[in-house]
Amino acid sequence: MIITIDGPSGTGKSTLAKALAQTLQFLYCNTGAMYRTLAYARLQPDWQEVPLEDFLASPPFSFSFSKDSPLQAFYGDRLLTSELSSQEVANFASLFSKEPLVRAYMQTLQKQYATVGNCVFEGRDMGSKVFPHAEVKIFLTAKPEIRAERRLKDLPQGSLSKEALMAELIARDQADQQRECDPLVIPQDATVIDSSDLTISQILEKILPLIPSHLT
């Protein structure tokens, strides 16, 4: 079974997807982290001038995904963790993900991971493009100020003001919604949930009744 959770940044997708996967004993795949991994690798000096086709044909990054562990990202042999949370990487990932070659490459990987077992996929086009026939589709929204407060917790203290981050989030929304290749849209048949004033437990209470009873 595939469950998709889509929505813009700061709506609580990652926290919800992890909690839902843990509750159901499903695998969890953070596809945003996959795009940020590509962006991080592309920003490294040795790879900035390499043609995109060559970069993707012999990538300096890799992923580990199995029933025993969530998605892990590597640059060479080094496990990437905090590197993927920087605003520079996030901003470049937004630009880089517009490339049709990049999206096709990533979507192929994501579909391969779906064969491993029951999975919760989190991203921006999971229910609309990658898994349009997913059994359960969730689309999260939240007020911009709430989203900015949440994202600030992931950034080094003092690196950005709430107002500046909120402006960046709104600009990212517009870019995601207006890109020609797989824009951010509410998937057909998706359940839309505003997470602004809800806890993760309250959101789970809305979602679990959508799951077949033998899996909950």
UniProtKB/Swiss-Prot annotation:
Gene3D superfamilies associated with the record: P-loop containing nucleotide triphosphate hydrolases (3.40.50.300)
UniProt keyword annotation of Phosphoprotein present: no
EC number(s) given by UniProt: 2.7.4.25
Annotated GO CC locations: cytosol
Pfam families attached to this UniProt entry: Cytidylate_kin
Cell location: Cytoplasm
Reaction(s) catalysed by this chain's protein: CMP + ATP = CDP + ADP; dCMP + ATP = dCDP + ADP
Family: Belongs to the cytidylate kinase family. Type 1 subfamily.
Protein name as annotated: Cytidylate kinase
Gene: cmk
